[in-house]
């Protein structure tokens, strides 16, 4: 197994090195703010970090460009629902915030990630499992006013420790986590590629991305700020009817992918099967369908 891991890492490096070309630079140098989301936890009232709160936070930052957690190839297509519901929400409301939205995520293949999960050293798996359990306990017992406060302080430190100290870069475990370092490198490149004319960029991704995105931006000479809370929790609020329609379309597409009536690549099918996005979208619709904003 050790020899296989060495060979695997060698293949990994041979794949990555051509991709790690001269870092992308934005001109003029934009101001970049990193804002963490909580995925399905936005739909739980006790977290005091709803999509309405997220919108207020983004609006208060006055972005020219919002970089969101959808790959360019999935954006507005059959696979958009595979990505976090809040990303489609932000894409839909961005024009009302006088901002552009750019789909900037990047993903490795499901087969490659699955193979790495099998090959991942047991001691690393055990450390990650323990860390996940400890983090869950901290989140449940945290005394911060909102989940936002925890995610942007203690949560950042935990994520940085997990991905830099426990997992590391260019390791089997790194690939088992979706090629985490390369993924965040590509996210930054995609954001900067979309940054023409943007004075202020807000990168809105799952909060665990924050420390690695900050590192990747620093490697390009950009000092990114971590967002501080600018909203007062206002309850679950509502979402525009266009968001409900978009979520419903995305949910229908995922269900059609799963039942075979919508043909996609084997990789896309495997990703949908191995995700909980159907449940996430159902939760989003259940939470917000009755409280949609009026146009």
Regions found by a protein language model. Give the residues of each.
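Bacterial N-terminal signal peptides that target proteins for export
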Residues: 1-7
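Bacterial N-terminal signal peptides
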Residues: 7-15
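Compositional signal for N-terminal targeting/processing segments
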Residues: 18-295
């Amino acid at each position: 197994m050790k020899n296989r891991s060495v060979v695997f890492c060698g293949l990994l490096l041979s794949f990555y090195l051509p991709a790690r070309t001269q870092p992308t630079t934005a001109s003029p140098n934009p101001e970049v703010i990193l804002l963490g989301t909580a995925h399905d936890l936005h739909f739980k009232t006790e977290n005091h970090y709803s999509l309405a709160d997220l919108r207020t936070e983004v609006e208060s930052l006055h972005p020219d460009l919002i970089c969101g957690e959808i790959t360019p190839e999935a954006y507005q297509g059959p696979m958009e629902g595979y990505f976090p519901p809040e990303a489609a929400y932000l894409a839909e409301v961005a024009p009302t915030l006088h901002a552009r939205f750019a789909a900037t995520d990047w993903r490795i293949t499901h087969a490659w990630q699955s193979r790495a999960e099998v090959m991942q050293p047991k001691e690393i798996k055990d450390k990650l499992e323990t860390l996940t359990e400890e983090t869950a306990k901290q989140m449940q017992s945290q005394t911060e006013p909102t989940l936002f406060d925890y995610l942007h302080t203690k949560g950042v430190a935990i994520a940085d420790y997990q991905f830099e100290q426990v997992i590391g870069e260019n390791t089997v475990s790194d690939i088992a986590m979706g090629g985490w370092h390369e993924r965040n490198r590509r996210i930054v490149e995609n954001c900067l590629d979309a940054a023409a004319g943007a004075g202020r960029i807000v990168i809105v991704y799952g909060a665990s991305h924050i420390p690695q995105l900050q590192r990747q931006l620093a490697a390009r000479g950009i000092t990114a700020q971590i967002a501080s809370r600018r909203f007062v929790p206002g309850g679950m609020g509502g979402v525009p009817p266009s968001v409900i329609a978009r979520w419903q379309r995305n949910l229908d597409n995922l269900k059609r992918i799963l039942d075979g009536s919508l043909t996609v690549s084997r990789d896309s099918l495997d990703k949908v099967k191995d995700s909980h996005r159907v449940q996430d979208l159902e939760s989003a619709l259940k939470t917000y369908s009755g409280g949609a904003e009026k146009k």
